[in-house]
Swiss-Prot record:
Residues 89-104 have a biased composition (Basic and acidic residues). GO terms for cellular component: membrane. It comes from the Eukaryota. Residues 89-140 are annotated as: Disordered. Residues 105-121 have a biased composition (Polar residues). This is Putative uncharacterized membrane protein C622.04. Its main location: membrane. Keywords: Membrane, Transmembrane, Transmembrane helix. It is found in: Membrane. The chain crosses the membrane at residues 33-53, 59-79. It comes from Schizosaccharomyces pombe (strain 972 / ATCC 24843). It is a multi-pass membrane protein.
């Protein structure tokens, strides 16, 4: 007997306030990355000028490539932080997915209705009254 395909998806829907808090945190990180980026660009320009006036040097070439690599890394991190901000109006992915085989399997095996009764006080009172009416009819 094969096991059913089980897929558990847990996704949290963010409220507007939670999204704005996350966005503020991300913008603070991105602002610091911008400061680091500008400092590295300035250092890269200093190395360029020194490299131009003093001539070829292996150590300056290494520093130049290292600074260029840091510039690329910092810019990638900035884009990553900005793209990681949750959007409250976005529809969660699990609502777009089709039902898995496991859900079809469970539907075919279940004898219970798919919709459950509401737990409101009015409906509970109606159920209680009908049960009491049935017990009175059965006893008489």
């Amino acid at each position: 007997m094969t096991q059913p395909d089980i897929e558990i998806v847990i996704k949290e829907d963010f409220t507007y306030r939670e999204c704005s808090d996350v966005a503020n945190d991300v913008f603070k990180k991105t602002q610091w990355l911008l400061y680091v980026f500008l400092f590295i660009i300035f250092a890269n320009c200093v190395v360029d000028v020194k490299y131009y006036f003093e001539g070829f040097s292996h150590s300056l070439l290494f520093v130049y490539f290292f600074l260029t690599l840091i510039i690329l890394l910092v810019s990638f991190m900035g884009f990553h932080y900005l793209n990681s901000i949750p959007k409250p109006e976005a529809e969660p992915d699990y609502r777009k997915k089709q039902e898995s085989k496991n859900q079809d399997f469970l539907k075919s095996q279940s004898n219970e209705p798919l919709e459950y009764a509401s737990s409101s006080a009015v409906e509970l009172e109606k159920e209680k009254n009908t049960r009491e009416g049935l017990t009175i009819l059965e006893s008489s």
